[in-house]
């Protein structure tokens, strides 16, 4: 847990030259499936809410695609409460129900309409102090690269003993090629000393 508390301090509480928080909206992804992105996002979101007492949202990137809102400014209306008072979530289940109610058009399609994507992220920034977006792995989805220019940065979850160095470095390159800000690696299920080259990015 100490590792994640340090991550919160160095990543989410970092302040820019203008005195404002640098990383309020952060996406998390992985090089491949099974790295534990959802586990890490849930854990960090909970600790972030508890440690800062700020309003935190945990959202699945798939839910953003499935909401199809008539007005993106109302995205926060579809939040669900969690066991932590100041931590909210938007699930794919809630999003699918909204899709059935409202229907889909090009104007409110997250994948095809960049203006709608931007409006959704702006609305989340307005309603929450921190937003953590759970993206599928880079091997199976374009979630992270689609969001790359809209979020403050992207962190890559690395599962101890599973992810190869070449995969990890390739994922960093994919984010940077999408004009995203690579924030570093988050090691999940650590069982042995962390390689120095990973720590250098955190």
What is the predicted role of each segment?
Residues 1-2, 13, 18-25, 29-35, ...:
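P-loop/Walker-type NTP enzyme "switch/lid" segment
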Residues 3-8:
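Phosphate/oxyanion-binding active-site loops and adjacent basic polyanion-contact surfaces
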Residues 36, 65-69, 164, 192-195:
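Short, charged/polar "capping" segments at the starts of alpha-helices
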Residues 40:
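Hydrophobic positions on the alpha1 helix immediately C-terminal to the Walker A/P-loop
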Residues 43, 47:
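Active-site signature of alpha/beta-hydrolase-fold catalytic machinery across serine-
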Residues 49-50, 148:
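Gly/Ala-rich phosphate-binding loop of Rossmann-like dinucleotide-binding domains
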Residues 50-56, 178-183:
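Structural alpha-beta junctions
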Residues 112-202:
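Conserved catalytic-core segment of NTP-binding enzymes
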